[in-house]
């Protein structure tokens, strides 16, 4: 394991180059807005405004509709039950001679008691009781998704109606009785008992007092309950019925929590579909309403679309939606928002179809009076396959959507809604996330008629379209999953071919788990080769747990399998065709929860239980929060704990998800033979109360709690807000008074690259002679067993420290400069902000009083003007050195580069950094800080405004590890040389980068080396910047430079030799380029204009630092592309050239031969650069494997030579850090 010892080798006396631990990591993303240099407050990668696709797959047969939602057969006062009624309201019943006008309505008085009961005199009913008594499973599903089925929906009035109970099946909805306190506080009856029935009564509830003699009164027709005529006194032997409808969103008596205000002045109940309507496009799939068991598949009910009054396509902006599903002023739902689809089905049926749309279908399936009950068979795998085909653009299966029989029978099969056969393409953007949210019970039937299956028991002739689909073999995929679940290969295949998976009963059953095979295939293999990148499908599923059947062991639940294998975090380099080993738990089980409390049944992250109404609502809300988090995913760059490809080598990847701005940190084992990555942990956290979170209070660290923050910028925060920042999620919600809903407690990680700090290397400094060098070996021995830690900054306002072995957070720190705007993070209307977004560095330094110490220095980057230092010698007892803001250091701006730790000739251990843009003076300055005291000196380089100094490169000209020279560029294109002599810093320009007279900004840290054969000092850097959207539109030419420092200012390009990009092409599927091979080197070095020989001037730029790798200088470029909304940061190249000529290498560097060997030549010349389709970050080398992390979170791995013969001192940190 590579530890802290490798981090500080930059100070070894026999290396002239003093470099940072980790290569610079700059994304085309940014932070604060200032009058000087504009810096965007959100990532500029692209795709952030692209809407996601959510297909709702409703496996609806009658148990899902008619089963009881609130499972407890005994009503318990004080327990809250879920349904259309407000548990915190009391109701009266409105009677009318017209049945459609009968409903419950809330009253202002009386108010409910503490146990949700009411004073029931005067005809009052308790809303909580009515939820328990009358709610069917599908009601809370509808309520959570759409706000509920509106049977009356006018501008000023909304009445909801419960689901139709179309069967007299008391086994699905038991007949219930209440008495005692439950009765007296729930219903307006002076009875000893209150007996009720729901089953078989449509939208009504029947109730009576007496059980009867030979005939149960509940089996006789009841009379409509009229509170003015039926006092329900003690001797009342009547049988009554109420229509279970409820008036909602009446502001005069108090609004329910899901009521949304409209410009009309009234309110409408809404659900998750409306809430996320600006960010998600929806479609719906279901079955035809046909009870014939040989009817296969599913049908498209509503095609993919926005459902709200506006569309939000990023390239168009906000526009009026021609297929809006509700009125923008009143919120009234439209019956037929997609008349074209309704008309097409009308033509096929011969009877008018007057309903369409996503919300309408979700509210009205099984509600329409077609004369037919809800279907009784559910071939769920075939239904899922229908959605699978939709996203793969394979087209409708005609046999699935055929309507047969009489006009009335066709109408019933259509369920009075469109059956869409002319499918469109649901994927509008290559970077869209595609998600399925399904609901159903596990007692499925006859769903095996799919590609690859030959067991046709209970199945009709396989449709031709299904036979033609060779993209998947469900039997092989299912056998593979069974192997991953622990079965032997032979047993797995036998199980995959079995006549039934978990439901084999006479006249039904013969089901499969092929839904899991389909979900796994769509989640791990590109569905659309015709589009750029991988188009994948993520599956979430809600199991309604029919009859309390949880399917234990849990691996016998097909929905659990589908959610696990269709929702796990796919590791980089994962091969879905060859993998048979179990998935790492870190990829699919991060919630720590179990199904029904069974510790052997771990709840997959995308699997939700709806065994009762309360759980269903919570499950759906959780599912949507995860879905939105997945909709816009991206990742930052990579880091490594080792330069060697050996056992224990680990790569760390930071990620962000722009749906809810959640972050994650993932650790991957690196295969020592192939370099393949296998995840073994995700960032995980203690309970929020137990987290160790600190902030700086004067010279010490204090707990980040409400009581300690009174003298900070967070003094006005509430305890709930501070607890939220600590990770408490109990106060999250969408109603007034609640805090923003998150899908995880860590904020997004964009520009802060993970920093690994392990144990020191005792072999360092064995020949050094500076103060303290002789004591280093003892310090290293003392610290040999300390816990390795990965540090990273996140945009939740914290530096996080994770145990590198487990991923568990052990410490977090909130810098003062992050506090002023941190409460915005808790706001429901939060728009992305940067907080702790800067780079980190760490080193071992010598303190003459305390000896050797390990220290970490961090910046806020785009998040603010701040800088902090911590003593991390003991990870269990991290201590404060200092925490500074621009109020302490006037020249400090948005520091966008890595701070450097170096020892200067006066014996001081210092922090060196460029001040960055937007300082008070708005100019470029070198900041030099005493690392132990925090005292800062500022060295201005010019008075020119709209400028800032970028990353610094320290250098030891005497080869003794003592820094006496620093190189840094600024945003106006000047490369500066700072020289330390006579205890003072002197500054002079080395070169000003220009193209045709226009300055080229330098935003990356330069790199230096000595050319051994000549002794000449070289400095390498590229130009360009990416701080705002304006920068992304800029197509000006940027360049790559190699300059010789001969002690004087280089007057211009005339004394530099020109290198050109001369050829571009494709080798083994990789975009590649070669550069020229100049024979004569300019007096002062070389330059290369980043101009494509085929595409011309594209604005290609170099905004991350160069690095050395063996015989090569490595540079990473980016080519913005504002024509592609999915990747505004564009693409780019990782290039490898001769550092001292700027030309191509004499031998191959990139191994592009997928079958082994080099394969690294284009038209006979060694390849100089390999293209990456998403903008690349600096590569990480582990052994001879180069891993390139891109803005979209993908990782490209390439082999490179295992060693190089470049005749220079060892200056690459990845070489220096070897023991």
UniProtKB/Swiss-Prot annotation:
One of its GO terms (molecular function) is metal ion binding. Pfam families: T4P_PilY1 (PF05567). Residues 212-234 are annotated as: Disordered. Ca(2+) binds at residues 958, 960, 962, 964. Induction: Expression is not affected by calcium. The keyword Signal applies. Its main location: other. Residues 1-35 form the signal peptide. InterPro entries: PilY1_beta_prop_dom (IPR008707), Quinoprotein_ADH-like_sf (IPR011047). Keywords: Calcium, Fimbrium, Fimbrium biogenesis, Metal-binding, Signal. It is found in: Fimbrium. One of its GO terms (cellular component) is pilus. One of the three PilY1 homologs of X.fastidiosa, which are involved in bacterial twitching motility as component of the filamentous type IV pili (T4P). Belongs to the PilY1 family. This is Type IV pilus biogenesis factor PilY1 homolog PD_0502. It comes from Xylella fastidiosa (strain Temecula1 / ATCC 700964).
């Amino acid at each position: 394991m590579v530890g802290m010892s490798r981090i500080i080798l930059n100070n070894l006396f026999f290396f002239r180059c003093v470099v940072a631990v980790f290569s610079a990591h700059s994304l085309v993303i940014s932070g604060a807005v200032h009058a000087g240099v504009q810096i965007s407050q959100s990532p500029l990668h692209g795709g952030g405004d692209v809407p996601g696709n959510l297909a709702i797959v409703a496996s609806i047969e009658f148990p899902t509709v008619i089963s009881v939602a609130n499972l407890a057969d005994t009503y318990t006062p004080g327990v809250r039950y879920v349904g259309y009624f407000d548990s915190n309201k009391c109701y009266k019943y409105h009677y009318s001679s017209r049945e459609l006008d009968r409903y419950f309505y809330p009253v202002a008085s009386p108010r409910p008691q503490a146990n949700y009961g009411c004073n029931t005199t005067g005809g009052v009913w308790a809303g909580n009781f009515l939820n328990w008594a009358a709610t069917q499973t599908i009601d809370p599903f509808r309520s959570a998704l759409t706000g509920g089925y509106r049977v009356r929906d006018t501008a000023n009035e909304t009445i909801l109606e419960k689901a139709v109970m179309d069967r007299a099946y008391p086994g699905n909805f038991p007949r219930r009785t209440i008495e005692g306190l439950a009765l007296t506080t729930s219903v307006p009856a002076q009875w000893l008992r209150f007996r009720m029935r729901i089953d078989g009564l449509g939208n009504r509830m029947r109730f009576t007092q007496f059980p009867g003699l030979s005939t149960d009164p509940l089996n006789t027709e009841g009379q409509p309950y009229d509170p003015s005529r039926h006092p329900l006194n003690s001797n009342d032997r009547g049988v009554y019925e109420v229509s279970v409808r409820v008036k909602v969103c009446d502001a005069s008596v108090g609004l329910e929590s899901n009521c949304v205000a409209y410009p009309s002045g009234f309110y409408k109940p809404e659900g998750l579909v409306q809430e996320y309507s600006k960010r998600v496009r929806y479609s719906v799939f279901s079955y035809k309403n046909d009870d014939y068991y040989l009817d296969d598949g599913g049908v498209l009910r509503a095609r993919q679309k926005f459902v709200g009054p506006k569309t939000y396509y990023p390239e168009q902006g906000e526009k009026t939606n021609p297929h809006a599903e509700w009125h923008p002023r009143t919120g009234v739902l439209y019956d037929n928002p997609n008349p074209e689809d309704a008309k097409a089905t009308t033509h096929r049926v011969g009877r008018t179809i007057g309903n369409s749309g996503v919300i309408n279908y979700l509210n009205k399936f099984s509600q329409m009076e077609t004369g037919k009950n809800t279907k009784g068979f559910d071939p769920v795998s075939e239904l899922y396959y229908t959605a699978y085909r939709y996203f793969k653009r394979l087209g409708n299966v005609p046999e699935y959507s055929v309507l047969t029989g009489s006009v009335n029978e066709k109408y019933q099969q259509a369920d009075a809604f469109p059956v869409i056969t002319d499918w469109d393409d649901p994927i509008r953007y290559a970077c869209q996330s595609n998600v399925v949210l399904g609901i159903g019970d596990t007692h499925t039937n006859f769903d095996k008629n799919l590609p690859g299956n030959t067991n046709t028991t209970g199945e009709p002739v396989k449709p031709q379209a299904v036979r033609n689909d060779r993209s998947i073999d469900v039997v092989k995929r299912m056998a593979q999953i069974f192997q991953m679940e622990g079965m032997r290969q032979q047993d797995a295949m036998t199980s995959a071919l079995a006549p039934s998976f978990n439901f084999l009963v006479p006249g039904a059953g013969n089901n499969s788990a092929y839904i899991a095979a389909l979900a796994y295939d769509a989640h791990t293999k590109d569905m659309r080769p015709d589009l750029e990148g991988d188009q994948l499908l993520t599956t979430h599923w809600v199991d309604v747990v029919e009859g309390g059947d949880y399917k234990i062991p849990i691996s016998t639940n097909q929905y659990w399998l589908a959610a696990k294998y269709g929702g796990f975090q796919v590791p980089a380099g994962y091969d879905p065709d060859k993998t048979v080993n179990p998935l790492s738990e870190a990829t699919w089980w991060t919630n720590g929860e179990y199904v029904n409390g069974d510790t052997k049944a771990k709840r997959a992250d995308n699997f939700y239980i709806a065994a009762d109404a309360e759980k269903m609502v919570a499950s759906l809300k959780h599912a949507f929060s995860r879905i939105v988090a997945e909709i816009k995913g991206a990742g930052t760059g990579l880091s490594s704990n080792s330069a060697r490809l050996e056992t224990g080598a680990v790569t760390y990847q930071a990620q962000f998800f722009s749906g809810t701005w959640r972050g994650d940190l993932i650790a991957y084992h690196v295969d020592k033979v192939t370099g393949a990555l296998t995840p073994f942990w995700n960032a995980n956290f203690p309970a929020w109360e137990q987290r160790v979170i600190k902030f700086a209070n004067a010279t010490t660290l204090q707990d980040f709690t409400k009581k300690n923050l009174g003298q900070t910028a967070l003094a006005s925060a509430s305890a709930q807000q501070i607890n939220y920042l600590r990770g408490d999620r109990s106060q999250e919600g969408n109603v007034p008074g609640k805090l923003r809903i998150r899908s995880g407690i860590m904020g997004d990680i964009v520009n802060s690259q993970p920093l690994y700090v392990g144990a020191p290397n005792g072999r360092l400094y064995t020949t050094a002679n500076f103060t303290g060098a002789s004591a280093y070996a003892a310090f290293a021995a003392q610290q040999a067993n300390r816990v390795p830690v990965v540090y990273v900054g996140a945009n939740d306002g914290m530096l996080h420290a994770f145990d590198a072995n487990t991923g568990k957070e052990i410490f977090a720190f909130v810098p003062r400069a992050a506090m002023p705007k941190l409460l915005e993070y808790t706001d429901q209307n939060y728009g992305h902000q940067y907080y702790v977004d800067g780079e980190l560095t760490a080193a071992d330094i010598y303190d003459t009083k305390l000896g050797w110490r390990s220290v970490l220095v961090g910046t806020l980057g785009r998040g603010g003007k701040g800088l902090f230092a911590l003593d991390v010698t003991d990870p269990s007892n991290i201590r404060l050195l200092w925490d500074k803001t621009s109020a302490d250091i006037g020249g400090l701006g948005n520091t966008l580069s890595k701070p450097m730790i170096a020892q200067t000739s006066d014996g001081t251990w210092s922090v060196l950094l460029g001040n960055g843009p937007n300082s008070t003076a708005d100019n470029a300055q070198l900041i030099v800080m005493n690392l132990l005291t925090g005292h800062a000196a500022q060295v201005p380089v010019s008075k020119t405004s709209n400028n800032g100094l970028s990353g610094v490169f320290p250098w030891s000209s005497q080869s003794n590890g003592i820094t006496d020279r620093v190189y840094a560029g600024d945003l106006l294109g000047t490369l500066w040389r700072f020289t330390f002599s006579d205890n003072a810093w002197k500054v002079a320009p080395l070169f000003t980068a220009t193209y045709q007279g226009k300055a080229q900004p330098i935003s990356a840290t330069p790199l230096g080396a000595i050319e051994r054969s000549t002794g000449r000092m070289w400095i390498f850097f590229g130009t360009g910047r990416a701080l705002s959207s304006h920068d992304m539109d800029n197509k000006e030419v940027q360049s790559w430079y190699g300059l010789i420092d001969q002690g004087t200012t280089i007057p211009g390009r005339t004394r530099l030799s020109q290198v050109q990009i001369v050829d571009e092409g494709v080798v083994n599927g990789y975009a590649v380029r070669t550069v020229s091979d100049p024979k004569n080197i300019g007096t002062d070095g070389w330059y290369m204009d980043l101009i494509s020989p085929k595409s011309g001037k594209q604005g290609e730029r170099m905004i991350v630092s160069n690095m050395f790798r063996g015989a090569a200088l490595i540079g990473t470029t980016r080519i913005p592309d504002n024509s592609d909304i999915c990747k505004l940061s564009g693409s780019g190249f990782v290039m490898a050239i001769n550092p001292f000529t700027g030309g191509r290498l004499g031998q191959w560097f990139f191994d592009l031969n997928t079958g082994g060997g080099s394969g690294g030549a284009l038209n006979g010349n060694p390849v100089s650069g390999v293209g990456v389709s998403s903008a690349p970050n600096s590569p990480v080398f582990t052994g001879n494997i180069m891993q390139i992390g891109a803005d979209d979170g993908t990782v490209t791995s390439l082999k490179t030579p295992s060693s190089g013969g470049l005749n220079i001192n060892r200056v690459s940190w990845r070489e220096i850090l070897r023991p």
